């Protein structure tokens, strides 16, 4: 488990607090492997736009029942708010992005890397400002986000019923039961 302690509960809690509510990106090959299970797993976008910049699939990490999940962000274009598509607002209460709980994916440590915020600040200050606005909204809402993620996982992995998640909403979410099998095989 590690050399912090013999207690797995302590280590799990320690790891959770260290990785949660920071931005991460996911290895392209791992995403491709997940996509073989569920074709709705999004792509890392390579060389987007006139500047040919990459736009990786990024999100926040949350640990749910010992599984590390990336909950992705997307732009504020054409999305509808629901229990599994959570809007993100800036300090002026303007909608700036969405957190796609329906697209959360389990990601082992070796297939994720923290976003270098200092590097983004130096190369793309506007994008840095957007990401900071997003994280400043997400962090105080961590408990609500985590509850929604736990609800989705309970429905998709354990076949439990949750009032907030209709059958249509559950079908809109990725196949977490099968994706977790890949995750567990990589640990």
How does the language model describe each region?
Residues 13-18, 92-187:
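C-terminal terminal-subdomain/extension
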Residues 3-53:
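GIY-YIG nuclease catalytic motif and its immediate N-terminal context
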Residues 48, 63-100:
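Compact nucleic-acid interaction/catalytic patches
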Residues 54-56, 101:
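Extracellular structured ligand-interaction cores
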Residues 56-63:
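Catalytic nucleophile-His microenvironment captured as a short glycine-rich beta-strand/loop
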Residues 27, 74, 108:
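Residues at the C-termini of beta-strands that transition into short coil/loop
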Residues 30, 77, 111:
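Residue-level detector of flexible, active-site-proximal loop/helix-junction positions
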Residues 35-50, 81-92, 115-122:
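Low-complexity, polar-biased intrinsically disordered regions enriched in Pro/Ser/Thr/Gly
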